[in-house]
Amino acid sequence: MELNLKMDRSKELFEESKKYLVGGVNSPVRSFKPFPFFVKSAKDCFLYDEDGNEFIDYCLAYGPMVLGHANENILNAVKSQMDLGTAYGVPSEKEITLAKEVINRIPCAEMVRFVNSGTEATMGAIRLARGVTGRDKIIKFEGAFHGAHDYVLVKTGSGALTHGAPNSPGIPEDTTKNTLLIPFNDEDAVRKVISENKDEIACIILEPVMGNVGCILPQDGYLQFLREITEENGILLIFDEVITGFRLSKGGAQEYFGIKSDLATIGKILGGGFPIGAITGKKEYMEQFSPSGQIYQAGTFNGNPVSVTAGIETLKNLDDKFYKETTKKADILSNFLRETAEKYNVSTKVYNVASIFQIYFNEKEVVTYEDAKSSDTEKFMRYFYTLLENGVFVAPSQFECCFTSIKHNDEVLEKTMNAIDIAMKKL
């Protein structure tokens, strides 16, 4: 695939990178053919590559950069903190400050344990659920991505699905024998698996909006159904809000949909561009973590002062006006995608919620993992390449989602819609 872009330096760097980094990248989602562009800098909603190309960014580092790249307030706060130290190994007051902010926003949050990534958060939350209930089995939905750890790398989405390995080799069958897989949005499947595994299931873990297989929305009443059936059966409900946390609303998906889970995992936006994750939930459960309880979770960089500082500064800016504006931008683009696809007679389904959106090249509604997999991925990549050639960057996969930030202004949206029109016309 030859792109109509000057990418000589990126090609050169990719060839060199392959000698030292596996596949030339440090995360599979960053890889696409013939080679990814290499970023030199980023500002607001733009990426600038090593060849001098400018791209409007709707990937936003896969979600965290809601305030745009290189936000001055965050940078200034972080620089001030770095003068005071970058890692302590003992508690600091800012950890309390950020924890209070999380608790004030997230409905289920009564206590917090900071970790270093979304993967660590979901791993810890599942361990906590098992420890609290004394049960081993977990329910996971097909296509949901809950990080790169063994218990959940089964029929997963994100880069694993994109690169053809939704069930990762290297994971013993014994490790996943207690992971029960069912389709999303299917109430009967939930009832059946709970009935067949009575008093053995510790938790149901889910992405309230499945953002790692595109953008699959919960059908009306589905999250409420999960809340009710878990309560009836002594099963903990875990919302994996690594994507939706602080993205859908101030209180994430719980506030947006009006459903309170037992535990929640958050990340991405929480760190304002720095590595962080968090497990949060009801006090009676959270206090079972060591040192107040016996369930062990630890990390050298847990509550890192630099990441925590960036998180505090980020959350300061996420008010009602912010959510209204970012949602409006995603609505505009989503509606334009629908209109333009119809204009050029391209079969698509477009889904959006708050500032998340994605297009599927599919004739049928996408409500499950299998629906998403039936989409025309080759057509999506042609759409992706045309957008890229016209200065717009979205995640290079049908099975990721797009995001708007506060920095996507009217001029940027106009340029984006022009690129979309060109891409749809070519299809």
Curated annotation (Swiss-Prot):
A Gene Ontology biological process term: protoporphyrinogen IX biosynthetic process
Subcellular location: Cytoplasm
Any one GO CC term of the record: cytoplasm
GO MF annotations in UniProt: glutamate-1-semialdehyde 2,1-aminomutase activity; pyridoxal phosphate binding; transaminase activity
SUPFAM superfamilies (UniProt xref): PLP-dependent transferases (SSF53383)
Keyword Flavoprotein set for record: no
Pfam families associated with the record: Aminotran_3
EC number: 5.4.3.8
CDD domains: OAT_like
Recorded catalytic activity of this chain's protein: (S)-4-amino-5-oxopentanoate = 5-aminolevulinate
Pathway: Porphyrin-containing compound metabolism; protoporphyrin-IX biosynthesis; 5-aminolevulinate from L-glutamyl-tRNA(Glu): step 2/2
N6-(pyridoxal phosphate)lysine carried by residues: 268
InterPro entries: 4pyrrol_synth_GluAld_NH2Trfase, Aminotrans_3, Aminotrans_3_PPA_site, PyrdxlP-dep_Trfase, PyrdxlP-dep_Trfase_major, PyrdxlP-dep_Trfase_small
Keyword line: Cytoplasm, Isomerase, Porphyrin biosynthesis, Pyridoxal phosphate
Main localization category: cytoplasm
Listed Gene3D superfamilies: Aspartate Aminotransferase, domain 1, Type I PLP-dependent aspartate aminotransferase-like (Major domain)
Cofactor: pyridoxal 5'-phosphate
NCBIfam families registered for this protein in UniProt: hemL, PRK00062.1
PANTHER family cross-referenced by the UniProt entry: GLUTAMATE-1-SEMIALDEHYDE 2,1-AMINOMUTASE, GLUTAMATE-1-SEMIALDEHYDE 2,1-AMINOMUTASE 1, CHLOROPLASTIC-RELATED
Family membership: Belongs to the class-III pyridoxal-phosphate-dependent aminotransferase family. HemL subfamily.
Protein name: Glutamate-1-semialdehyde 2,1-aminomutase
Provenance organism: Methanococcus maripaludis (strain C5 / ATCC BAA-1333)
Gene designation per UniProt: hemL
